[in-house]
A protein has these predicted regions:
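Conserved C-terminal portion of the radical SAM core fold
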Residues: 1-52, 56-77, 81, 99, ...
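Glycine-rich, charged/polar anion/phosphate-binding loops
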Residues: 72-80, 86-89, 170-172
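A short catalytic or substrate-binding loop motif that flags glycine-/basic-rich loops and adjacent residues
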Residues: 82-85, 177-179
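Radical SAM enzyme core and accessory elements
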Residues: 90-206
């Protein structure tokens, strides 16, 4: 299970911390939370006000502030396969209501190359982090309860992996072709793969 709350300014932006703590409390049934800022495409009738949109840096700041230190801003990194302005992700182990980060900023790793597409890499991440692993028997489990013990830690990575992610959709007022070219989320239509934001792009009444 991945929780996927849509965030709307003046509606639930102050509930980010509560949503995160609830998701952690439900681990390992809940494998992560995806914060989705409301998009202004599709059937949106008009252009949003200037402060309606939620930015990624604002969302990262609020996640750190409202989590009371459970998550730090530097633990939420740009996607290594999409454009860095399109989203972020954090990879953690959940243990006793706390999150232990598995990622750190490193300019030499996690760079998308030509060996596989961005979509392939994202599918591999989902398979690795969001699918439930096989259940070990009692004799195979480490019961020490110490996250610093290697066997216990490796068990927890498999069974209590937890992700925090977000994706910022584009609309008619924010469309950026450099972001669109690196899209990994597509709609298949009439034999073509069309970037998600472009497929649902709608004009606004002036």
């Amino acid at each position: 299970v991945i929780l996927d709350p849509t965030l709307v300014r003046d509606i639930n932006m102050e509930n980010i911390g509560d949503l995160l703590r609830y998701a952690i409390s439900q681990s390992p049934k809940v494998r992560g939370i995806h914060f989705q800022p409301a998009g202004y495409f599709g059937r949106i009738p008009g252009k949003p006000a200037g402060n309606d949109r939620i930015t990624l840096d604002e969302l990262i700041y609020e996640t750190e502030r409202q989590s009371d230190g459970i998550v730090k801003a530097e633990e939420l990194l740009p996607s290594c396969c999409d454009h860095p302005l399109c989203g972020f992700h954090g990879d953690f182990v959940a243990d006793n209501g706390r999150l232990f980060p598995l990622l750190k900023q490193d300019n030499k790793v996690n760079i998308c190359g030509s060996d596989s597409s961005a979509a392939d890499k994202n599918r591999a991440f989902v398979a690795k982090r969001w699918l439930r692993p096989y259940k070990k028997t009692g004799s195979q489990q480490c019961g020490c309860g110490d996250i610093h013990n290697m066997d216990y830690f490796l068990d927890k990575v498999s069974t209590h992996g937890f992700t925090i992610t977000s994706m910022l959709f584009q609309d008619a007022g924010t469309m950026d072709f450099s972001r669109l070219r690196r899209c990994s989320l597509h709609v298949y239509d009439n034999g073509k793969l069309i970037p998600f934001c472009a497929y649902y792009l709608s004009a606004w009444e002036q």
